From Swiss-Prot:
SUPFAM superfamilies: Histone-fold. The gene is NFYC3. This is Nuclear transcription factor Y subunit C-3. Keywords: Activator, DNA-binding, Nucleus, Transcription, Transcription regulation. InterPro entries: Histone-fold (IPR009072), Histone_H2A/H2B/H3 (IPR007125), Transcr_DNA_Rep_Reg (IPR050568). Ubiquitous. Residues 1-28 have a biased composition (Polar residues). Its main location: nucleus. Heterotrimeric transcription factor composed of three components, NF-YA, NF-YB and NF-YC. NF-YB and NF-YC must interact and dimerize for NF-YA association and DNA binding.
Amino acid sequence: MDQQGQSSAMNYGSNPYQTNAMTTTPTGSDHPAYHQIHQQQQQQLTQQLQSFWETQFKEIEKTTDFKNHSLPLARIKKIMKADEDVRMISAEAPVVFARACEMFILELTLRSWNHTEENKRRTLQKNDIAAAVTRTDIFDFLVDIVPREDLRDEVLGGVGAEAATAAGYPYGYLPPGTAPIGNPGMVMGNPGAYPPNPYMGQPMWQQPGPEQQDPDN
């Protein structure tokens, strides 16, 4: 009885993030198999990202048609003009934004779909997008528009340290030791230069305390 009580007290006082991470991972003899499968999934994601960006670089180098785009340039130009400081926009600027938006959507979809397959589903859901956002530092600007419950579930779901190997490198950034893809001059930056996601595990807003309420009320 004393041992059981001590074990329960230890479990209750442990770090909740560690507890959730452990409960999502099979224990005992199944743990090596889970670790191997998870590692294979991350290696597959790394290969998919490399292939994706290699294809994007080749398409950019071969682009000759600057008039037809997947996204409407008029809409992009209208969004750009929402900034009151923007007076004039050249014809080339919306073209660059259209291509950038297209690549952004494609990569976010690729990362989200990876989470869909991890959960053995065939339909991409909003929590898959939340997973892609929380696993990739460069997407931290999206935390304010990701549904809070999905973001919390993904953080508390125990994203393992291994998941950050491939999933944490955004926009053509490759893990250390990986050969560059495409034109060497087009490989962007160093992934190690990015700090950890400051929004990870933090609430997106805080409820005002009694001292912050309007004194008139």
